[in-house]
Amino acid sequence: MIGSPWMAAILTLFLWWFSTGIILWRVRVADNGTSQDHFNSVVIGLPLVALGICAARASLTDLSTNGIYLAFLAAMALWGWIELAFLSGVITGPNSEPCPPFVAQANRFWRAVGTIAWHEALLVTTLAGLGLATIDAANPFAFGTFALLFVARISAKLNLFLGVPRINVQFLPKPLSHLASHFRVGRITALFPISVSALTVFSALLLERAINVEHPGMSVGYTLLTCLCLLALLEHWFMVLPLPDEKLWRWMMPAAKSQKDHLEDANGL
């Protein structure tokens, strides 16, 4: 059953929805607590890093269906922890200031880079580590999964910076509240059609490999990547189409505490 492409598609969809939701939930809970709670979240999540590294290493020589799933989950675990560290404000960048209005485009770009520089450096380092580990490995899907997530995320960030009609900031945590000033709500730029076209073509290429490859494990691996690429494409369209994507996770979120609530908690009232 785990060798079924449908099972791979369902797993990818569920993992995308659940992992996004649990990270957003944990960040909101920490937002409602103290500043230390965000750091605690990242520390509590450290086993994900250990599990991800161990799983990625164990999957390198295993091209079975189980090995493919292990590689995929390893990459998702590493990615999930890095995203948690970013959204918690622990690993971000040297610039934590809002972007002033009417800043020149080049200045605005480097300010935006400064808000995420350390986070991007960690992503690149992890990607390079997985790449080196899988150069001669039978199972490259841990690297493939992480690389796909990385490229899709870079594309999304660039589109948010250059301009898209819809930007959902209601889940933006307090440590990253300054990021909203670096986004641009407006008409799409030339990058958006390039991004969605590239993701569409790559999804089709991955689907072709999933259908035509004879090895059952490889077929599952390409199916997982196809679904992940289609979800990345969907996330890009969420930036343009008037779809209530926030409803997928909003019901999971505890109510955000007001500043008054925080002051009362601090005074024990």
Each model region followed by its residue ranges:
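Helix-coil boundary and interhelical linker segments in multi-pass alpha-helical membrane proteins
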Residues: 1-6, 54-73, 129-144, 205-223
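N-terminal signal-anchor/start-transfer transmembrane helix
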Residues: 11-28
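Transmembrane alpha-helical segments that form the membrane-embedded catalytic/substrate-channel core
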Residues: 18-21, 77-92, 147-165, 227-242
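C-terminal transmembrane-bundle signature of multipass membrane proteins
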Residues: 18-21, 184-269
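A generic, lipid-embedded transmembrane alpha helix
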Residues: 41-61, 78-82
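Intramembrane catalytic core of multi-pass membrane enzymes that act on lipidic substrates
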Residues: 65-119
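Cytosolic, membrane-interface loops and tails of multi-pass inner-membrane proteins
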Residues: 91-108, 159-183, 246-257
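Hydrophobic, aromatic-enriched interface-forming segments
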Residues: 112-167
